[in-house]
């Protein structure tokens, strides 16, 4: 009987509150993320300080978002939509979007498909062209 050596399944498990895991990126002043890559999708756990505003941007990848903690305003396709803990949303590829955290800040889980190449390494920025607010 031949047993092939493989990675433990435990390596596929993470916790949104464990700040010591993931690929770390700074997305803007008061906005940081931890990235977890798979072959077909990517998870980004974003921490946004109170009242911080993310830059409006777009990318070709589809993006799902889940508000884990806090509240804010999602700016998407030119609309401003209030979001709170438990809300989730879809941002189709190439749609301008951003976020403004509420007075208590926010923690958001974003899921990208396919994975964003720009996020596969630590660093800063969104890795895409930033749009000027209208």
Q: Where are the regions a protein language model picked out?
A:
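Glycine- and acidic-residue-biased ligand/ion/polar-headgroup-sensing regions
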Residues: 61-72, 77
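Short acidic-glycine-tyrosine-enriched beta hairpin
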Residues: 78-93
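A short, N-terminal "cap"/entry segment at the start of jelly-roll beta-barrel domains
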Residues: 2-40, 121-134
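Structural motif
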Residues: 42, 71-73, 96, 105
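Conserved short histidine dyad/triad with adjacent acidic residue
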Residues: 44-58
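Ligand-binding loop in jelly-roll beta-barrel domains
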Residues: 93-118
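Histidine-centered catalytic micro-motifs
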Residues: 55-62, 95
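Short strand-coil-strand connectors
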Residues: 39, 75-79, 102
């Amino acid at each position: 009987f031949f047993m092939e050596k493989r990675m433990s399944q435990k390596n596929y498990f993470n916790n949104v509150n464990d700040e010591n895991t993931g690929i770390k990126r700074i997305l803007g002043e008061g906005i940081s993320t931890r990235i977890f890559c798979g072959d077909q999708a990517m998870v980004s756990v974003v921490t946004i300080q109170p009242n911080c505003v993310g830059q409006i941007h777009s990318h070709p990848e589809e993006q799902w978002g889940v508000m884990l903690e806090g509240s804010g305003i999602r700016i998407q396709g030119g609309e401003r939509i209030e979001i709170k803990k438990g809300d989730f949303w879809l941002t189709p590829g190439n749609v301008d979007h951003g976020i403004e955290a509420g007075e208590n800040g926010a923690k958001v889980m974003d899921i990208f498909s396919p994975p964003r190449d720009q996020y596969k390494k630590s660093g800063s920025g969104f890795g895409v062209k930033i749009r000027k607010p209208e």
